[in-house]
């Protein structure tokens, strides 16, 4: 069981690493421009990007586990229909979101914490990025179906192709062509287009076990409900992440100004990198757990949960120790402005104080999603972000903590939300499977 999980998790972890580089390489390059306004402007776009990714996860992470479960039962025709319906949903969401966000981008950006200084940078980036929304939907939303069929290396290549294109084009567009944030956005859109074409080529080709076919694209209400119900967990997590980013940026803008919005952009970038292996391992276990659960191999599911828990927690503790030891070194990867570093180091240590507890949330969530328990997955997605982090982000700064209150909300939520999710999974899933 451990070998099966690692066979899925290692390529997915590499894919997650590449995907993180894909997402943060813009920030690394823009951080090298004079000042911090370009980096801050990009940071203001991140909540909107999280929303777009949330809709992609709604379809991809909702449909892919269902495909694994039906494959385990030998029901490949139904698995293909889920694949086709998920693709149609991605197209519909992508088109609607593009029109809406382009029409209302100015009020949205100011609502999300933009100032008159940072709005031009955020607007330039977002306008171009939104033109590639369909590419984001297809590349991110359809790639989990590669993993659901056991082609985790192909899933890794989808991400690797986009990342390579982005890394190569970024310095050309940003510096050589002097396009600044517009160049970063254009490079990202072209990279996402390459990823989308790659994943479509595979899923319509002969190698795929489950193919994307014309006769599976017509939406069927019951099937759509199942996809959306299971995908709601990933969707809610992305939405609540976006909500927290908005509240953080707005609070930091109020209590600390543009500088602290830039600090949070750097912190979020580092968090994405260090949490990447946790996401790779827990995402990698989902198709294995789902397949064995569908086949009735409950003891193998229990062994998979044990292995995933030990591996994930072990990594998280080691990563936490490293992060707390060298904050300045990590911050300088993105920006070396003395003012930002001076403000960033104490904020960094406060934000990451209980980082290792975040792995508990990922473990519980992955088990719930992998076994098709959508209600539990949705509840714990909401609990940590919407019911703990968001209120604390508003409450603590007003109690005299200022910007420190914004950063302190994260470790509190990691402990409370993470433990609640892990313990509930143990009682309601792990123990019951052993009976």
Predicted regions mapped to residue ranges:
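Small-residue hotspots at the loop-to-helix junctions and early N-terminal turns
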Residues: 34-47, 122, 126, 185, ...
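Short alpha-helical transmembrane segments in multi-pass integral membrane proteins
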Residues: 1-9, 67-134, 176-232, 289-354, ...
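Hydrophobic transmembrane alpha-helices of multi-pass small-molecule transporters
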Residues: 51-54, 166-171, 196-200, 272-276, ...
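Short runs within selected transmembrane alpha-helices of multi-pass transporters and secretion channels
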Residues: 60, 129-147, 155-163, 184-197, ...
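Transmembrane helical elements of multi-pass membrane transporters/channels
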Residues: 7-26, 128, 162, 191-195, ...
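N-terminal transmembrane alpha-helices
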Residues: 1-28, 32-33, 47-62, 66, ...
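Helix-terminus/linker motif at the lipid-water interface of multi-pass membrane proteins
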Residues: 17, 21-40, 109-116, 172-179, ...
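Small-residue-rich hydrophobic transmembrane alpha-helices
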Residues: 39-99, 136-155, 249, 263-321, ...
